[in-house]
Amino acid sequence: MTKARHELSWNSDAKIPNGKPKGGFKSQNGFTINTGVVNQIDNEPVSPREVKEEIKVTDRDIGVLFPSLLFKSRVSDRDFLSSVKDRILKATKDENRGTVAGDPKDPLGWYSFDNLHLHDDMQDVHDFLLKESAAVFAYYDFKVEEVYLTSMWANVGYKPFYCHMNHTHPNSIFSGVFHVSVPNVGTTHAQTTTFSDPRPAARVIEPNVNKDFAAHNSGTVSPIVNNGSLFMFPSWLPHGVQQSYQDYNGTPRITISFNAMMTGEINTRTAPIKFT
C-alpha cells in the first residue's frame, strides 16, 4: 500500500463527522479530508479514532513562564513631590538644563538633559532613586560592590497629543520611571508608562482571550499610577507613553527617568561578567 499523490483544492462545503459545517480540502478524485491532515492509504481517508471510555483529567492549571519583572513602589510625601515638581518646572525655563519650553520643535513637552543627577538641586531625588535602585539589585544574587546612576532626566508633557515612542535603554542593566505629577484626565494611558511584550514572535498568533484577560496574556500593559509612583524594570523592556487626546487640565505630566548600573560581578557557572 502506498500513500496517494493528488492535488488538493479548498472545499467550503466540507463537513465534519458531527454534521457541523467546516472548511476542508477536497481532492480531485472526489473525497474530502475533514481533519486537515493528508493521511490516507490507497485513496481512502482515515477516520478519527473513536474514544470509547472517558478519560478523566485533574489538576488543570495555567502557569506563567519567563516573566518580565516590574518593581513598583510609591512616595507619599506630598511636600517632597511638590518641591520636585516646582524645581523641574523652573528648570524648563533654563536653556542650559534642556530643551526650551514651548520650543516649536516640540511644543507639547520638555526634556531635560540626561545629567540631572549631577545638579545640586536634584541631589535628594538622586539619593532616593539610588536607594531604590540598590534594592532592585539586591533582589538578584549579584556580587555588588557599588550601585550608581549613569543618567537621569526629566520629561514634562503639557498638552494633549503628548507621547513618547516605544523604546528601550541600551547599555544599562535597570531603568526606572518616577511619576512626579500625574494629570487627572480620566484615562490611564495619558498618565502612566505603557510596557510592551519584548517577544515580537509571541504576537504572531494572537487570539482573543475572553476569560482571565490580564497582564500575563496581554501585548501591552498600562499600570495605574499616582503622584509618586515609581517603576523599575530591566532596561531591555520596551516602554513608552501613549498619545492622549484629552486636556491635561493645567496639570503637566512630569516624570523622571534614569538608568542604573553596578560595579561588581554577575556570576554564573559558565559566563561571569565583571563590571568595573
Task: Give the ranges of each region predicted by the language model.
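Catalytic core of Fe(II)/2-oxoglutarate
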Residues: 212-276
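Catalytic core of non-heme Fe(II) oxygenases with the double-stranded beta-helix
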Residues: 154-232, 266-269
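Arg/Lys-rich, low-complexity, intrinsically disordered basic segments
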Residues: 2-35
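Short, solvent-exposed loop/turn segments at secondary-structure junctions
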Residues: 78, 183, 200, 237-239, ...
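Hydrophobic residues positioned within well-ordered beta-strands of beta-sheet architectures
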Residues: 71, 150-152, 174-176, 254-258
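Active-site region of the double-stranded beta-helix
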Residues: 120-150, 158-173, 180-188, 273
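Short edge beta-strand segments in beta-sheet-rich domains
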Residues: 149, 188-190, 251-255
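Non-heme Fe(II)/2-oxoglutarate
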Residues: 39-142, 161-163
